[in-house]
């Protein structure tokens, strides 16, 4: 199936080694659609390694996702009566809640062009988030032994990735001005007793549209990407 290119920024030379397609849908996207698009582009990169990489920046309609091997014990509702769709997917980590007001980034990158090391990649995604928050005069923090980002001991961003022959999918989710009630239906990321936060709690009135260009630029800078048209 073709990738929905959505909104593209100014094209550059698609032969550039850091070229990447930027996909920014205007409306909230059903999870199944974005997952299919990621897998499609991942497969294309496996078959044609010279192609540009791709990054999706979007919001999801409300849903819950469970990583590989995630325990359903972290769901506080019966699976046959979920408050929103539930998807078991091919990423690491436990349960995550997606919804409007949360900015999601899905980089489909070939780590062989950088460093074929998933631990390195996870730390780089955390650094992207730290860089974004710094632009807002907020100091994001890592917690030892955990993946994601915290502000004042409240988790504001979740990270979970999948990888096939060093080509990534899935990514990160940053809570900006989303409702938090849906997180009470699960144990987010399997971390009992850890509070969830959103950036608007620190910066009243902050909108997702203000943060999206910061995340776009931080990803481009960290992974040396130049946005381009579809190959």
UniProtKB/Swiss-Prot annotation:
PANTHER family: LIPOYLTRANSFERASE 2, MITOCHONDRIAL-RELATED, OCTANOYLTRANSFERASE. Catalyzes the transfer of endogenously produced octanoic acid from octanoyl-acyl-carrier-protein onto the lipoyl domains of lipoate-dependent enzymes. Lipoyl-ACP can also act as a substrate although octanoyl-ACP is likely to be the physiological substrate. Transmembrane segments: none annotated. GO terms for molecular function: lipoyl(octanoyl) transferase activity. Keywords: Acyltransferase, Cytoplasm, Transferase. GO terms for cellular component: cytoplasm. The keyword Acyltransferase applies. InterPro entries: aa-tRNA-synth_II/BPL/LPL, BPL_LPL_catalytic, Octanoyltransferase, Octanoyltransferase_CS. Belongs to the LipB family. In the reaction, the free carboxyl group of octanoic acid is attached via an amide linkage to the epsilon-amino group of a specific lysine residue of lipoyl domains of lipoate-dependent enzymes. This is Octanoyltransferase. One of its GO terms (biological process) is protein modification process. The lineage of its organism: Bacteria, Bacillati, Cyanobacteriota, Cyanophyceae, Synechococcales. It comes from the Bacteria. Residues 49-227 form the BPL/LPL catalytic domain. Pathway: Protein modification; protein lipoylation via endogenous pathway; protein N(6)-(lipoyl)lysine from octanoyl-[acyl-carrier-protein]: step 1/2. It comes from Parasynechococcus marenigrum (strain WH8102). The active site is at residue 189. It is an enzyme of class 2 (transferase). It holds the Pfam family LplA-B_cat.
């Amino acid at each position: 199936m073709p990738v929905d290119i959505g909104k593209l920024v100014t094209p550059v030379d698609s032969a550039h080694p850091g070229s990447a397609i930027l996909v920014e849908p205007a409306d909230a996207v059903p999870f199944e659609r974005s997952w299919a698009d990621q897998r499609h582009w991942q497969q294309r990169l496996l078959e044609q390694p010279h192609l540009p990489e791709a990054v999706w920046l979007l919001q999801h309609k409300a849903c819950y996702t469970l990583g590989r091997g995630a325990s359903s014990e972290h769901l506080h509702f019966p699976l046959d009566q979920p408050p929103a769709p539930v998807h078991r997917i091919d990423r690491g980590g436990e349960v995550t809640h997606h919804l409007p007001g949360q900015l999601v980034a899905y980089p489909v990158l070939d780590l062989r062009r950088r460093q074929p090391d998933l631990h390195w990649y996870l730390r780089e995604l955390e650094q992207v988030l730290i860089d974004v928050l710094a632009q807002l005069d907020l100091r994001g923090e890592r917690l030892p032994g955990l993946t994601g980002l915290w502000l004042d001991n409240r988790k504001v961003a979740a990270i979970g990735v999948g990888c096939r022959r060093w080509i990534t999918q899935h990514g990160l989710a940053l809570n900006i001005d989303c409702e938090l009630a849906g997180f009470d239906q699960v144990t987010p990321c399997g971390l009992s007793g850890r509070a969830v936060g959103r950036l608007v709690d620190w910066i009243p009135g902050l909108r997702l549209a203000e943060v999206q260009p910061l995340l776009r630029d931080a990803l481009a800078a960290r992974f040396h990407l130049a946005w381009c048209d579809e190959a």
